[in-house]
Amino acid sequence: MIVESPAKAKTISKYLGSEFEVLASVGHIRELVEPKNVPKELKKTAFGKFAVDVDNGFTPLYGITAGKTKTIQDLKAALKGADELFLATDEDREGEAIAWHLLEVLKPKVPVKRMVFHEITKEAIQEALNHTRALDNDLVEAQETRRIVDRLFGYEISPVLWRKINRGLSAGRVQSPAVRLVVERERERMAFVSASYYDVKAVFDTAAGSQSFEAKLQTLDGKRIASGDNFDDLGNLTGNVLLLDEASASALADAVGKSGVDISVTSVEAKPSTRRPAAPFTTSTLQQEASRKLRMSAKQTMDTAQGLYQEGYITYMRTDSPTLSSQAINAARTQAAKMFGADSVADAPRVYTGKSKNAQEAHEAIRPAGEVFKTPAELSSLLHGRAYDLYELIWKRTVASQMADAKVSTTTARIAVGPLGDGRVAEFSASGTVVTFRGFLAAYEESYDEARNQDDSQAESKLPNLEVGQKLKLDSVTAKDHQTTPPPRYTEASLVKALEEDGIGRPSTYAAIMSNIIAKGYVTKRGQALVPEWIAFTVIRFLEQNFGKMIDYKFTASMEEDLDQIADGKLDAKAWLTHFYFGGDDMTGLKDTAENILDQDPRAINSYPITDAITLRTGQYGPYIEIFQEPGSEGADENGRRIVNIPEELAPDELTPAKAQELVDAPIITDRVLGVDPATGFEVLFKDGRYGPYVVLNDPDAAKPKTGSLFKSMSPATIDLETALQLLSLPRVVGVDPETGLDITAQNGKFGPYLMKGKDSRSLGAEDEIFSIDLAGALARYAEPKYGGRRTAATPLREFGEDPASGGQVVAKTGQFGPYVSDGFVNATVPKDDTIEDMSPDRAFELLMARREKLGLEPGQAPAKSSGRGAKKTTARTVKAKGKKK
């Protein structure tokens, strides 16, 4: 039996007898060749540009995945002693494609059966063994078509970006619309004009004084008071409402607060309502809720969920269906009744159906595995950290989905104050909500993204018992100013939601898209918010002007629907690819669109006027402000051109004309000599660079002179020699740990100040602690538990467990050339598109396998300590025969 991962193989092996040998392919064993790796003899053929022959049925050129030669040899060797082959890869498109590639490469001479399951339990595995099927060729072709169209899109458009904007940029079928959404939201924020308004709130007491409550002014003589929702995004007031400014609001508050004014309840209305539980998780809703509740990225969520699935704790994590099987419904209802009481369970089983048209993903929601769900408490000794938190989230959501509606009662009271001194009557309103029956709320409550102009005072609360005509006493009255807020930036959760609502992408792609747009430098994260970089504005503007249809949301969604039709066998893949690439009567194809880009001035493409005199430009080394002044004047070149750096932390919507002028008007930071280092006799210089101000020891013989960045709390204008020498002395040795004999050093990094002892780090609270903390203070920090420490500073950064091939313990470390993974025998560099934080164990094992393959080493064998290098190993490649039946 062949599965994708060692962890999955290990779990399944527990449920099968000795007659089965369960092996892992560790992901794909064959992939579409990168164009740069196309063999020489094919470079000048139709395969040369894309590794896809677009002139002959879009035939792809496949090659063995790096590091998989040994895996293939092992699988072939195992097949020799087998009398049957079960392909047990995942049940989605990707899993079906892996199974097909295994067949193509292994060419088994024994009977082959395809088995699928959505959870790894003994019962599910046995059920899958009893109900095998043939390979789904439509699914395979759908995956292949997606891979080809993504290759055509990326490799046709990206080179245009290199020529017109900058090298290293990339475009993607789903990636580019995702970036466009983020950029468009930032454009809305940049165009937004904030408006000011006031409201008046009062705190009333009942006559008995038993309970006070807050109410908000709603009308004045019947005219509604303006709130944040009454302004458009340009700050214009809409609707027939009364706008209170500071003077009128203060005068009104004073009038309400005068003694002798009549205050009485004019109406009390109670409205019962019910709240239904949320549906069980799909891939996208799991990513959204894990982001909101657990602060996990989409990739962290998927990696954690994959681990839970492979260990047999949850069902398959890539699905767009919220449906539960009858077995799962029974398990959820039974557990809800046991833990929360029989009356907490819905009268009848709840059946959820999905809205997605994509019929080719897994067909059940993400839920705890098995006929009886394990409670989080039962797994508390087995699951830890993110794994436990995510399992608990899934368990709660699943159980709650079969529980009864919550019953809620909302009471709204209207209170009349007046007549006031001018004869007008002010009407206040107060609402209180109480839960009369908790139902599913006993287990779980869904989170939501924060709304714009949200009034925190209207949070749920309980009102005292009030009656119409009842007199009240005024406790206090306050006038408060407010500013309307711009549209909120996307978070990973809300961006996934937007993509899903627009029909862009599929469950299996969202996590990769979130990671890619950040890794490729188009988007950064500020807390949970996604902030576009200026280069994203440049790229999206260029794509909108030249490839508008290709990044149009509706067009991208229609492509997804077409690809689903291919999976259903309703569309011919080759005909569809031909229409997409070469075009037809109804549209210009990608090929002609890319080839007919008009000549454009690169400076114009990369320019954004901030004012008539100030222009923002995106360059090779990032964004900057350009102005022209008197040639030869301070900061200007002979043509009068002056460059002003933009602070790295300044978001695009914060670069207003006023802010740009402030940056231009700021004192010019010039390089200067601060003095002489008494220890070396070399000058200490102050400089201002792309990443901010720094000091440098001007050693003419040093290949890389010693530097030190200024702390955020330091001013370039007041930096002196003493402070500069302190910066150049870092890292500072605080003292020696008496237990280990290791030096403890204090230093500053990208994520702030920290201590380092050997391979162990601890964060410091403030930058000045770097110079002030003593040995006793440092030892006290190390005596405290380490909570989510600095991954980039500590070594090892992560532990992945035992490598299934070498048996070594795999860890992630950082070295002179960046992060890498090691099993104690071999080190493998972590590619720039991967991150240590989000890396799964299987990915770490795969990198080590590829490295061993490249070095020609067996698992557990270390490289010879010599400078000699062996001959470069050539990866065998195969071309899928045209029209070959799968």
Label each region the model flagged.
Residues M1-R147, E156, G228-F231, G239-A255, ...:
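Intrinsically disordered, low-complexity regulatory segments
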Residues K10-T11, S18-F20, S158, A191, ...:
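Basic, low-complexity terminal or inter-domain segments flanking catalytic cores
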Residues S250-A279, S284, A290, V477-Q483:
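Pre-Walker A segment
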Residues G67, Q73, K80-G81, I120-F204, ...:
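C-terminal or mid-to-C-terminal helical accessory/interaction module adjacent to the motor/catalytic core
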Residues P6-A9, V26-L32, E91-G95, H118-A124, ...:
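Conserved nucleotide-binding/hydrolysis micro-motifs of P-loop NTPases
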